[in-house]
């Protein structure tokens, strides 16, 4: 396996264009671009720098592209997109990370040859607002899969998973293409150690099939799961569920559908909420 692409940034600078230039490195994927067989397809820092933690903040713009048979597709490291308020320079404004993935495929198939174990497609570590729209996340069984593989793993991170939309003939907006997750232990994870996280996650217009847990939240500050479909059935460990939330004080679940797979264990659940410490909807 090769090392993949590194996108170097500056943790102390924003992601906006300034005087025609960006402070941050940018990786742009389009027109059916493919990155495959990498240890980390896109790593958003310089691990060889004297202080790697100062080189975060790089930007990814990916559309109509594929990440195939990588041990990890994308790894975001801690970064906040901060800048001075234009009218009140004494104030600092925090914006979402401008990185996005639109209509992209993240897949590991039977051709994956290791030797690194596949653990997760995307790692988001202490960032906020990274967007995934109309993306497909897939995993086929192979001997190099970790015992508990994950689609998107957010650690104290904010992110959005959504479908794409178009205008219908009656003037309303309809879903054009949903995001999908298939065959993971946990498809989408939002977690944190210690205090409840402040960054929010949103999952909308997404189909989950053959996952032990579709959405798993632990110590997440605020989460929203809307207009998504969960086919519950796979079992690797414990009781499968479409949504599992623990120590998560605010979780909004609306207009979701839960069904059982044709092959399913005796115990399975649509939603499990444990020790929410607050009122959940």
How would you describe each model-predicted region?
Residues 1-2, 20-39, 62-74, 94-118, ...:
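Beta-strand-rich solenoid/repeat architectures in extracellular/passenger domains
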Residues 46, 51-53, 57, 73-100, ...:
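Extended alpha-helical scaffolding regions
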Residues 124, 244-247, 272-279:
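Exposed, low-structure sequence patches enriched in small/polar residues
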Residues 11, 25-27, 32-33, 58, ...:
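Small-residue (G/S/T/A) turn/hinge positions that recur once per unit in extracellular repeat modules
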Residues 161-163:
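Extended assembly/interaction regions that build large supramolecular complexes
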């Amino acid at each position: 396996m090769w090392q993949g692409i590194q996108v170097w940034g500056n943790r102390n600078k924003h992601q906006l264009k300034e005087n025609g230039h960006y402070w941050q490195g940018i990786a742009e994927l389009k027109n059916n671009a493919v990155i495959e067989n990498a240890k980390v397809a896109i790593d958003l820092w310089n691990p060889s720098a004297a202080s790697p933690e100062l080189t975060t903040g790089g930007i990814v713009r990916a559309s109509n592209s594929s990440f195939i048979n990588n041990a990890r597709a994308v790894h975001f490291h801690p970064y906040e997109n901060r800048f001075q308020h234009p009218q009140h320079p004494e104030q600092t404004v925090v914006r979402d990370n401008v990185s996005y993935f639109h209509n992209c495929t993240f897949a590991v198939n039977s051709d994956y040859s290791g030797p690194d174990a596949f653990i997760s497609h995307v790692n988001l570590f202490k960032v906020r607002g990274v967007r995934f729209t109309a993306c497909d996340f897939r995993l086929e069984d192979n001997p190099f899969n970790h015992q508990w593989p994950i689609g998107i793993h957010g650690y104290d991170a904010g992110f959005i998973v959504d479908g794409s939309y178009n205008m219908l003939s009656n003037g309303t907006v309809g879903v054009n293409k949903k995001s999908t997750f298939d065959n993971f232990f946990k498809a989408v994870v939002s977690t944190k150690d210690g205090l409840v996280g402040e960054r929010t996650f949103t999952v909308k217009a997404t189909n989950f099939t053959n996952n032990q847990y579709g959405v798993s939240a632990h110590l997440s500050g605020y989460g929203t799961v809307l207009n998504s479909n969960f086919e519950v059935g796979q079992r690797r460990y414990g009781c499968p569920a479409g949504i599992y939330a623990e120590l998560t004080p605010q979780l909004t679940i609306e207009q979701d559908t839960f069904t059982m797979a044709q092959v399913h264990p005796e115990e399975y659940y649509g939603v499990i909420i444990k020790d929410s410490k607050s009122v959940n909807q």
